[in-house]
Amino acid sequence: MPGIRGPSEYSQEPPRHPSLKVNAKEPFNAEPPRSALVSSYVTPVDLFYKRNHGPIPIVDHLQSYSVTLTGLIQNPRKLFIKDIRSLPKYNVTATLQCAGNRRTAMSKVRNVRGVGWDVSAIGNAVWGGAKLADVLELVGIPKLTASTNLGARHVEFVSVDRCKEENGGPYKASITLSQATNPEADVLLAYEMNGETLNRDHGFPLRVVVPGVIGARSVKWLDSINVIAEESQGFFMQKDYKMFPPSVNWDNINWSSRRPQMDFPVQSAICSVEDVQMVKPGKVSIKGYAVSGGGRGIERVDISLDGGKNWVEASRTQEPGKQYISEHSSSDKWAWVLFEATIDVSQTTEVIAKAVDSAANVQPENVESVWNLRGVLNTSWHRVLLRLGHSNL
């Protein structure tokens, strides 16, 4: 398309932070050290996980770049970046999380397919841009619309990004029209991240941000928006990112038997120490993140030192020095909380964290109960082992 192109090879990739752990080089998939996630409430752009399916698109001429709005609408049109920037701008603090976050731990139970991720395929950012609900009004679709006279019920986002899973075609995903037109769903066409222009890795010049939903639906390098009758038939909606039971394998899988995953479940992870960490005897600070999808707040984070028999509640913050309350009026409803608890360690100790969201959803105890062949949505209790010895902690 004019102004932007998806290259077929990897010779013009952007620079990346040297501390990122590279899980796949081509396409580039990497995550920061887990300790970086609890260093600040808002994750620095350079340390935000990178999830890609092909070479990073290149913008040749920003003024020529446009997004096509088409499909079941009366008046299809093109919007240039200046048109989108002329709409009211909103800043939304929202956590994005790859559905494969914590896949590596799931693969230790049984083999799974997918990029190996530790606990850092997640990040929290302030996204700036226009609300999708405002953009759709420009083509005659009012706010809070679930369906139209032309039969539209879904909104599909198509990327410039070309990927092998689509046989060289574009990456695409969709959400319901009711979510797209709901101003309180805060779906953005974002051109800023943490107050700066999006960089190439994160979707420059324009991306979708769908808060509370797995990252696969927040399409980067936006090419077109299609208003359609059925959900997107793209590979990543129909043959990936679905939650199957442990009994399903690659011989008996039926992709059409499951709906595409949208909201992510309640999740938490300990980030101040590694899965196995040497510590000195005495007090140890346990820090991590907790988040739930769908705009559900975190009701509490529990810490156990005895295998889950007894629990203590960790403190939770979004803003330093302010008590967190999981209500929309007093919290960033799409964003994680950071938690902290100080424990006394006198012997080898397994530390467990689990979160409970505002709908009383709780993380499952064992990874075995949520194992699936694609290794997605590992939200089991997070466990780390502290051993006594020499340590910098």
UniProtKB/Swiss-Prot annotation:
InterPro entries per the UniProt record, alphabetical: Ig_E-set (IPR014756), MoCF_OxRdtse_dimer (IPR005066), Mopterin_OxRdtase_euk (IPR008335), OxRdtase_Mopterin-bd_dom (IPR000572), OxRdtase_Mopterin-bd_sf (IPR036374)
Keywords: Metal-binding, Molybdenum, Oxidoreductase, Peroxisome
Gene Ontology MF: a single term: molybdenum ion binding
UniProt-listed Enzyme Commission number(s): 1.8.3.1
Biological processes per GO annotation: chlorophyll metabolic process; response to sulfur dioxide; sulfur compound metabolic process
Gene3D superfamilies: 2.60.40.650, Oxidoreductase, molybdopterin-binding domain
Annotated gene: SOX
Gene Ontology cellular-component terms listed: cytosol; mitochondrion; peroxisome
The species this protein was found in: Arabidopsis thaliana (Mouse-ear cress)
Binding site for Mo-molybdopterin: Y49, K50, R51, N52, H53, C98, S159, V160, D161, H202, R207, S218, V219, K220
Cofactor(s) the record lists: Mo-molybdopterin
Residues of the signal peptide: none
Quaternary context: Predominantly monomer; also homodimer.
Highest taxon, organism lineage: Eukaryota
SUPFAM superfamilies given in the database record: E set domains (SSF81296), Oxidoreductase molybdopterin-binding domain (SSF56524)
Residue span of region Disordered: 1-27
Protein name: Sulfite oxidase
Biological pathway: Energy metabolism; sulfur metabolism
Catalytic activity: sulfite + O2 + H2O = sulfate + H2O2
Pfam families linked: Mo-co_dimer, Oxidored_molyb
CDD domains: eukary_SO_Moco
Location of this chain's protein in the cell: Peroxisome
Annotated stretches, region: Moco domain: 10-242
